Design a protein with these regions (language model features):
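Membrane-proximal intracellular helices of multi-pass ion channels
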Residues: 1-491
């Protein structure tokens, strides 16, 4: 294990974090708020630790898949801890568990909160909550790789460990160029949404924070009623962009290079569109009886369907009061998630397609045992290694869900609350049902349960494997001499 190089990369993450923390400081200063001091102190702490870790570049640059997973897991934990500092130092979230929960929820783009009154927070803290969504949406290491080629030719190990979906590929030959293209598209879409929200009469602050939260498919609102207090125009703009950010970013790259044929052939995109369309129509019909018209029902249904399937978590209504069929569909969408290569959480559409095709092939093999079965996705053959990884993902996901559920149920809360709380955090959705519904929060859970949720949020955002590897004892078995050498080099 190359501890020296892992520490070096984490140091650069903290250096960038120190710079990120200065942005909400400017917001606090603009509104003449005391929270600006908290961001300055937090920035200095992050920069100090970061510079300590990066003052000496390690000579050993051997970096493999194991180091990639460990670096990503530790990097996100370090990012979350430093991101919690402004909440604690400002005194606006004085409890350590709550501050860390809010920070992890922000970076993992979950949007679950322990706060009952977000409108009481300062503008700087509100901006920081939304900004953590934007930082975490595309991935902090993706951003760092845009600026610094830290791992030289081994950047793919970092990208693979952090990127959402069963596999990650290059849009262009160089991994760093791929990262820059992805972030360019990400930033451009964020700006376009913000401009459209301004046209709808939103204030500049509201438009910026909402755009940041939508882009990361996070869902931290700046109003206690989430998006319910805004006009239908604004709600529709947000709904459309939630859908847009749930699409694989490769599709937008194909648009830029003018390859419409490949876009139209995308099986994942067509499945995503189909699920959103069917779910919207079914829910609209199911709730239309209690609303003024079918058009209002369609608007509300489309907003909530896109919000949940993309794991953004914004809400315009309290869907806790919707019929059971509608709630059942929303819970199902929590697990599905958006497309691979998007900022969405959840299992991902591509994994579901691969698992479904593999299941059909296995059933078919009983009837035709000698037939060669091939799985194809987006016109390409899916390798056996990818199929195995998808199968392993589902098994690991189920075990993690069951284990988390067991620990949460120790508190004796309602089954509906506990089940959807795990689903909402592990899939990075945010709101669940009952006690963790769209108008509720996670503040009432014990520190143990909050730790379970925090682990689930990180595991869900990082596609399970990095967090599992981090806590696997066999990974850390190494020759004592090598470990001492690497740690000495890191310091």
């Amino acid at each position: 294990m190359n501890f020296g190089f892992i520490t070096y990369i984490i140091g650069w993450i903290l250096n960038f974090q120190g710079l990120f923390l200065l942005v909400p400081c400017i917001v606090s200063m603009a509104y003449n708020e005391k929270s600006g001091f908290a961001f300055v102190i937090s920035s200095l702490i992050s920069l100090t630790v970061g510079m300590l870790f990066t003052r000496k570049k390690p000579t050993n640059k051997s970096f493999y898949a194991k180091e990639g997973f460990i670096t990503v897991a530790l990097g996100w934990i370090a990012l979350s801890v430093s991101g919690a500092l402004p909440f604690l130092i400002s005194g606006e979230i004085p409890n350590v568990f709550n501050a860390l929960f809010e920070s992890i929820s922000g970076y993992t783009t979950t949007g679950a909160t322990i706060l009952s009154d977000v409108e009481s927070l300062s503008k700087g803290i509100l901006f920081w909550r939304s900004f953590t969504h934007w930082i975490g949406g595309m991935g902090v290491l993706v951003f760092v790789l845009c600026i610094l080629p830290l791992a030289d030719g081994n950047n793919m190990h970092l990208m693979r460990a952090e990127s959402p979906g069963p596999s990650v590929g290059k849009l262009v030959p160089k991994m760093r160029s791929t990262a820059m293209i992805l972030y360019g598209i990400y930033a451009a879409l964020t700006v376009v949404e913000g401009i459209l929200l301004l046209f709808g009469g939103m204030s500049l602050f509201d438009a910026v924070t909402t755009s940041l939260a939508t882009a990361g498919t996070g869902g931290f609102g700046i109003k206690n009623n989430s998006m319910a207090d805004y006009s239908m125009y604004i709600q529709n703009v947000v709904a459309v962009f939630m859908f847009i950010f749930g699409v694989n970013f490769n599709i937008y790259f194909l648009m830029l290079v003018r390859k419409p044929k490949e876009i139209l052939q995308s099986e994942e995109l067509k499945t995503y569109l189909g699920i959103v369309l069917v779910a919207t129509v079914v829910i609209a019909l199911n709730i239309s009886g209690s609303l003024s018209s079918i058009w209002v029902a369609l608007q509300q249904a489309f907003f909530q369907v896109t919000s949940i399937i993309t794991t953004t978590g914004f809400s315009t209504v309290d869907f806790n009061h919707w019929p059971e069929l509608s709630k059942f569909i929303l819970v199902g969408l929590m697990f599905m998630g958006g497309c691979a290569g998007s900022t969405s959480g959840g299992i991902k559409i591509s994994r579901i397609i691969i698992a479904w095709k593999n299941l059909k092939n296995e059933i078919s093999s009983f009837v035709h045992p000698k037939r060669v079965q091939v799985i194809r996705l987006e016109g390409r053959k899916v390798g056996n290694d990818v199929v195995k990884s998808v199968n392993a993902y589902f098994v690991l996901y189920a075990l993690l869900f069951i284990g988390s559920m067991f620990l949460i149920c120790i508190e004796n809360g309602s089954f509906e609350t506990n089940f959807t709380a795990i689903a909402a955090t592990l899939n990075n959705v945010g709101p669940g049902l009952a006690g963790v519904g769209p108008m509720e929060n996670f503040g009432g859970f014990s520190p143990l349960s909050k730790c379970v949720f925090m682990f689930g949020m990180l595991a869900g955002r990082l596609e399970l494997i990095p967090m599992i590897i981090l806590f696997s004892p066999w990974v850390w078995k190494n020759k004592r001499s090598n470990k001492k050498k690497s740690l000495k080099e890191a310091i």
